[in-house]
Amino acid sequence: MAELKNDRYLRALLKQPVDRTPVWMMRQAGRYLPEYKATRAEAGDFMSLCKNQDLACEVTLQPLRRYDLDAAILFSDILTVPDAMGLGLYFEAGEGPRFERPTDTIDSIKKLCIPDPEDELGYVMRAVSTIRRELKGEVPLIGFSGSPWTLATYMVEGGSSKAFEKIKKMAYEEPATLHMLLDKLADSVTLYLNAQVANGAQSLMIFDSWGGALSHHAYREFSLRYMQKIVDGLTRHADGRQVPVTLFTKGGGLWLESMAETGCDALGLDWTVDIGDARRRVGHKVALQGNMDPSVLYGTPERIHQEVDQILASYGEGTGHVFNLGHGIHQHVDPERAGSFINSVHELSPQYHK
């Protein structure tokens, strides 16, 4: 593997000195880019794009050709793991992901097998190794997975949900059944992420997109507990370097202290949290990633610049901050506005690292 030329992102996650705040964007390889749309059209559909290692590599690299970013993130989907468990993932126009065979009974959960990441998920591993090779050491590669709770919401509901009725019913009516599912998912995700590291991922991120839908105590029982299990089982060194781990619960501002106790290296923040307040609460333990509202990218370059300035000032001096959006970039954002965002971070952040 080529030697890493820009390790700013990894250093910031480990709270080591950097010359400026590193920046990347969640969903930076995505529908806001015309070149992504062209490659997706070539693939035919979303999962065909994910399962073609060369096309997955191409879309991963596209934002790096446009922007001076400090990290690449594997192009894939959080639902690859449940798909590999045999649930029959498909995408309904206008409705998002669906499963042919939801796991909403104890019998269906008992039948689930933990997928072999090098077999059923081998296409992801081939994409990871291809991307790592093609990056040529320019920036580090982030691997990722959904959290057990978030994956379980799709598996039990049969797809996307707003109220999470089925899985919350299971949580309170049959908690042992849900714990069985979450336990299998934690084991599956641990294997999956470790395989990504073995194939070249240099940092890991766990996306807990729906943890914020849980009550204060239910979050600890059904989400955090299983992210803790994963963190405990992850490969934390590879290629002579630490492999930093970031946890991101959307709507998780209530639980930053508890999340920081897991032993992860960094926490992702959504835009509802003040990053300066988050630093005061947990900055002695973990780095922070975030957290501009993605909708700010609809604003003028001046408005974007102002928001970046405000977030940098709120975090303050020193390392331990990776600039990002508070969630994925919206598909209708002008790519030029994303460029304004990245340029503003480059321009404004060095003063905080003298």
Curated annotation (Swiss-Prot):
Stated role: Catalyzes the decarboxylation of four acetate groups of uroporphyrinogen-III to yield coproporphyrinogen-III.
Residues annotated as site: Transition state stabilizer: 77
Residues reported in the UniProt entry to bind substrate: 27-31, 77, 154, 209, 327
Full protein name: Uroporphyrinogen decarboxylase
Organism this protein belongs to: Shewanella pealeana (strain ATCC 700345 / ANG-SQ1)
InterPro entries: UROD/MetE-like_sf, Uroporphyrinogen_deCO2ase_HemE, Uroporphyrinogen_deCOase
Keywords: Cytoplasm, Decarboxylase, Lyase, Porphyrin biosynthesis
Assembly notes: Homodimer.
Chain's gene name: hemE
